[in-house]
């Protein structure tokens, strides 16, 4: 793909994602957002959670159409609304990812506030959530039957969903956090050493790399989760080799301890 000029990418975002008299996101945010969209289109990540402004699904659709006019491969991308949040997803890639989740490709970490420390759990221990994954897959399969729109939009009802876990799997995290909602949103991660993983990849010349992933796992569970994390890294590196828009994938980790962790 021939990369549009940074000026055109910034203009596309600022013309469509501004609300009222406010302009769209700042220049650096506009360029990073375009890189994330391209990463979703190329299958390097299944989805991105839009949090650059208060723009809703119609504005995000307009933005993606604007990018398409600049030569971006946005046809087939979809704006998925969940509980007042908008995600830009590639339905086919997300569906494949969720099907792998059902096969046990990822682990979950229970961080319920009632526990003294985090614990690994499997999808089989989260039967309600397993049914939810099936529901999302069914929804995405319906979307793939309608290719009439370049960029489509839909909404998923989510009144009783654990959004922390839902977003974790949709964004492609290999080890999402989960917790028992009937015990509130408190968690047991405060003052717990966390290993934070960050994956970045270069795109535009003379611009900072695009942040593909950022997630954490409790350091106490790192050894038991290492195989899943290694598989995730290997898969990401394989996908990066199948495209030509990005280069120089970098995956790093650091250990942090925080007084409180918001999920």
UniProtKB/Swiss-Prot annotation:
Coiled coil: none
Protein name stated in the entry: UPF0739 protein C1orf74 homolog
Membership in a protein family: Belongs to the UPF0739 family.
InterPro entries: DUF4504
């Amino acid at each position: 793909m021939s990369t549009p000029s940074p000026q055109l990418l910034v203009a596309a975002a600022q013309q469509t994602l501004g609300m009222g008299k406010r302009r769209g996101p700042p220049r650096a945010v506009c360029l990073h957002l375009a890189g994330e969209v391209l990463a979703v289109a190329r299958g390097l990540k299944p989805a991105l959670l839009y949090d650059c402004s208060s723009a809703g699904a119609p504005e995000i659709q307009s933005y993606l159409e604007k990018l398409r006019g600049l030569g971006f491969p946005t046809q087939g991308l979809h704006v998925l609304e969940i509980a007042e949040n908008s995600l830009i997803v590639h339905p086919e890639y997300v569906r494949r990812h969720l099907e792998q989740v059902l096969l046990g490709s990822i682990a979950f970490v229970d961080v319920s506030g009632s526990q003294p420390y985090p614990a690994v759990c499997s999808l089989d221990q989260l039967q309600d959530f397993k049914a939810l994954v099936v529901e999302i897959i069914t929804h995405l399969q319906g979307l793939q039957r309608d290719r009439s729109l370049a960029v489509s939009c839909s909404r998923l009802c989510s009144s009783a969903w654990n959004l922390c876990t839902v977003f974790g799997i949709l964004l492609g995290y290999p080890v999402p956090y989960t917790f028992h909602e009937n015990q509130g949103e408190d968690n047991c991660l405060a003052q717990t050493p966390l290993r934070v993983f960050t994956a970045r990849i270069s795109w535009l010349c003379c611009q900072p790399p695009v942040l593909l992933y950022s997630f954490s796992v409790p350091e106490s569970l790192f050894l038991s989760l290492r195989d899943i994390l290694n598989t995730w890294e290997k898969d990401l590196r394989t996908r990066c080799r199948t495209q030509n828009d990005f280069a120089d994938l970098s995956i790093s980790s650091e250990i942090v301890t925080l007084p409180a962790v918001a999920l």
